Amino acid sequence: MTASVAAAPDPAGLDPELAHIAPALKAEILAQALPYIRKFHGKTIVIKYGGNAMTEEKLKHGFARDVILLKLVGMNPVVVHGGGPQIDDALKKVGKTGTFIQGMRVTDEETMEVVEWVLGGEVQQDIVMLINQYGGQAVGLTGKDGGLIRAKKLKMPDREQPGQFIDIGFVGDIETINPAVVRALQDDAFIPVISPIGFSDDGQAYNINADVVAGKMAEILKAEKLVMMTNIPGVMDKQGNLLTDLSAREIDELFADGTISGGMLPKISSALDAAKSGVNSVHIIDGRIEHSLLLEILTEQAFGTMIRSH
């Protein structure tokens, strides 16, 4: 078998669309980023990477470059990735369709095998490869590596029958996270790329929602910032307007009236839990916008939805 090796991208061509910008303006843009570079220097930034940013080629390459830039200016990015569309595609090939309850994928034994293969293999390897091709040093991890994520079977409350629980298969609830694994990589200048798969003490694999893993990882690592990339501008009200700032009380109201539902339930719950645990800055942003990660971290531009604990 002949191994295929992708050619490293030409650094001179990383952002050809910027070629027309005057040098003075480029310098001004960099100068505006300086206060944020100072603010987050040496800090851990947890990034939930998902949605179109993972499937559109231009956005994928842009994300890899953005993560490397954050590392080069002294931040410690930690990437937790999803892969819902890729899992759905793989399930179709074996004649299965995805089913979700309260934003969580119902995961039988066959689906769990697909999830492990897709997330811990194909998707993770693609992210690691791109970051490394652009000059970064990324290392892929699952929950099994170094006992990173210990999990147990999730007991999902049945909202229609109080006191009852819904069995959604091999979906995990995080018991512990071993921060030493991630910190050891950070100390050696690596960028951790984490697949949201946990393992029990007896070796059973569990599918864990990536938003849940990102939020808990931010808490345990004492991250300065948690950024969740998604396929919408942020949290929207029922009229489709962007809510730029949400408190815990406002989030409870949006849960109660059904404004937040489906896949946004675990996302917002995890974001709020992270904010309550001491993560100073929690944002949900539109990953469909090029360089949205840099815009959120390195500029004053109001972007997405900020989640507050009070």
Swiss-Prot record:
Site label Transition state stabilizer, positions: 48, 267
GO biological process: arginine biosynthetic process via ornithine; L-arginine biosynthetic process
Entry keyword set: Amino-acid biosynthesis, Arginine biosynthesis, ATP-binding, Cytoplasm, Kinase, Nucleotide-binding, Transferase
Disulfide feature: none
Presence of the UniProt keyword 4Fe-4S in the record: no
HAMAP family attached to this UniProt entry: ArgB
Record-linked PANTHER family: N-ACETYLGLUTAMATE SYNTHASE, N-ACETYLGLUTAMATE SYNTHASE, MITOCHONDRIAL
Protein family per UniProt: Belongs to the acetylglutamate kinase family. ArgB subfamily.
The protein's role, per its UniProt record: Catalyzes the ATP-dependent phosphorylation of N-acetyl-L-glutamate.
This protein's name: Acetylglutamate kinase
